[in-house]
């Protein structure tokens, strides 16, 4: 879903410009926003002709009603204050503007989470907001149109290392580090690997994704 001929697109949580080429082709002005200076530096190197700003979902460095299209691919799951995040989206959108956002729901990486539970009792997977929490956070403002549709799918990998690498490829690791010991130890990895093998099916090791796609249209 995308608006017709948007003048300005803002990519929240742009990371190292994974979506930039596609989004830039849709608009006259593309603006990437990310909280990480390192990610922005990579994006700037790849696309020096575009604009990049450091910022966060809950405090967008943008003027009121200045954006035609707010786009965000797998960045909302890092936000604790959903109410403020959607208030910011509403604030920066022009009348008639559209926001297309996707994020992860509980149940994502369930096999990985269950396997980690056999290694230790520390959190290794983000706590994802429920669909009810997300929909409620959008109710503060009188959107012209709201759509929430979910999509579930399972990837399969030949081994655990490939599976974990694929998660890091999202832009920032969705798996939290062990804060006490830093990088994973060899023994922990072996335990995790052995446990995860019990989930193997004919296609390989499963990695579950539960995604909600959100479309919000501001009244004109």
Q: Which residues fall in each region the model found?
A:
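Conserved alpha-helix/loop element of class I SAM-dependent methyltransferases that forms part
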Residues: 1-7
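Class I SAM-dependent methyltransferase SAM/SAH-binding core
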Residues: 8-59
């Amino acid at each position: 879903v995308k608006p017709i001929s948007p003048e300005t697109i803002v990519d929240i949580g742009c990371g190292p410009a994974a979506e930039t080429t596609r989004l830039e082709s849709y608009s006259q002005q593309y603006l990437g926003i990310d909280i990480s200076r390192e990610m922005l530096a990579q994006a700037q190197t790849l696309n020096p002709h575009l604009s990049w700003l450091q910022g966060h979902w809950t405090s967008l460095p943008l003027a009121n009603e200045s954006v035609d299209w707010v786009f965000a691919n797998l960045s909302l799951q890092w936000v604790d204050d959903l109410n403020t995040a959607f208030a910011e989206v509403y604030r920066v959108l022009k009348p008639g503007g559209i926001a297309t956002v996707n994020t992860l729901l509980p149940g994502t990486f369930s096999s990985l989470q269950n396997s980690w539970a056999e290694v230790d009792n520390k959190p290794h997977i983000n706590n994802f907001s429920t669909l009810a929490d997300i929909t409620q956070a959008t109710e503060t403002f009188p959107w012209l149109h709201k759509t929430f549709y979910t999509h579930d799918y399972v990837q399969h990998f030949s081994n655990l290392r490939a599976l974990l690498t694929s998660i890091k490829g999202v832009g920032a690791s969705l798996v939290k580090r062990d804060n006490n010991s830093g990088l994973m130890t060899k023994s922990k990895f072996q335990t995790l690997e052995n446990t995860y093998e019990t989930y193997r099916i004919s296609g390989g090791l499963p990695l579950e994704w539960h995604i909600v796609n959100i479309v919000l249209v501001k009244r004109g």
